[in-house]
């Protein structure tokens, strides 16, 4: 029994030493993040982005921030108004529905993560 106890203690100490040495190594890396909140598309905004053929182009609206979005490692935007599809009429407050083309234009601007979980998710 004593031999089993000593063997267990030695094994525990060896593994503790090995684990401690692995933790001592510095593997830290830095991540730069930019976050934008409340990309809320009211009717005046999507009407401004609408072309005569019914398509939408939101890219000019994001052109002033494109360079600021490009430099961080991760760019996050909170898409406040839902993209409910083109079969449902586009609308603003209180029951938002935003043209789906805004998603592609947000990605083209340089955003990596688009959040859709917010208080307008079920509009």
Language-model segments: which ranges?
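Bacterial N-terminal signal peptides
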Residues: 8-18
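Bacterial N-terminal signal peptides that target proteins for export
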Residues: 1-9
């Amino acid at each position: 029994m004593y031999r089993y106890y000593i063997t267990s203690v030695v094994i525990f100490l060896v593994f503790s030493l090995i684990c401690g040495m692995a933790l001592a190594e510095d593997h830290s890396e830095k991540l730069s993040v930019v976050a934008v909140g409340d990309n809320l598309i009211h009717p005046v905004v999507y009407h401004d982005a609408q072309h005569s053929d019914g398509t939408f182009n939101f890219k000019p609206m994001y052109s002033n921030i494109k360079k600021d979005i490009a430099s961080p490692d991760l760019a996050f935007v909170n898409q406040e108004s839902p993209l409910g599809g083109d079969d449902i009429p586009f609308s603003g407050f209180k029951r938002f529905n935003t043209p789906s083309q805004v998603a592609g234009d947000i990605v083209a601007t340089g955003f990596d993560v688009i959040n859709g979980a917010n208080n307008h998710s079920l509009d």
